[in-house]
Design a protein with these regions (language model features):
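Intrinsically disordered, low-complexity segments
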Residues: 1-5
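C-terminal interaction-tip segments
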Residues: 6-7, 11-37, 46-49, 63, ...
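Extracellular and analogous surface-interaction loops
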Residues: 39-51, 115-120
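Short, well-structured hydrophobic secondary-structure segments
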Residues: 46-94
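Noncatalytic modules at the cell exterior or secretory-pathway interfaces
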Residues: 50-59, 118-134
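Extended, solvent-exposed segments with strong compositional bias
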Residues: 78-121
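N-terminal low-complexity, charged segments
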Residues: 106, 118-121, 125, 145, ...
Length: 169
């Protein structure tokens, strides 16, 4: 139990140190419909040396109805109905949500832990794509980003990566 307390205290210290050095921003909203839904979230503020690292990505249903969706964040628009694909360099984060509101007493909502490419820094545009079941529902989203100052070299690499070019390791 002592080791757990020490770990929690150490984690808190690390978080407060990080918070002092970083600025966090959120994008949130909702989108209504079914099938393939898209939203363009423009992050291009004209500052080439400003980037954002996605640190959190959450979606959930706004109604108490059966529904499910897959959501993807990308630096380029996705083709409607295309699957989530980690081999595509422009895709940054993936998540899904399933809600079952059956007529029985058992009701459930499940949010998949988001899978986020923490090496990707968004420098210009960010696209949010939903692939949902065929029911008109309101889907909510919350995206947490860490604002980062980029050197000229880092900014150029971020733009190259946004255009789906592999910069290698």
């Amino acid at each position: 139990m002592v080791s757990v307390l020490l770990f929690e205290q150490h984690t808190r210290c690390q978080r407060s140190d990080t918070m002092a050095k970083s600025t966090y921003r959120t994008l949130r909203g909702s989108i209504f419909g079914n099938g393939n839904l898209k939203r363009t979230l423009l992050l291009d503020d004209g500052l080439i040396n400003q980037g954002y690292r996605i640190t959190g990505f959450f979606v959930w249903c706004g109604e108490l109805l059966d529904g499910n969706c897959k959501a993807t964040l990308s630096s380029q628009p996705k083709v409607a109905g295309s699957p989530q694909d980690a081999s595509i360099n422009t895709e940054i984060a993936w998540t899904s949500f399933v809600q079952e509101m059956a007529a029985t007493s058992i009701r459930s909502s499940v949010q998949q832990d988001p899978v986020i490419d923490l090496d990707h820094v968004v420098n210009r545009d960010l696209y949010l794509s939903f692939n949902t079941n065929n029911i008109d529902l309101t889907w909510n989203y919350l995206i947490v980003m860490e604002a980062r100052k980029l050197s000229d070299d880092e900014a150029i690499l971020a733009i190259i990566r946004e255009e789906a070019q592999n910069v290698g390791a």
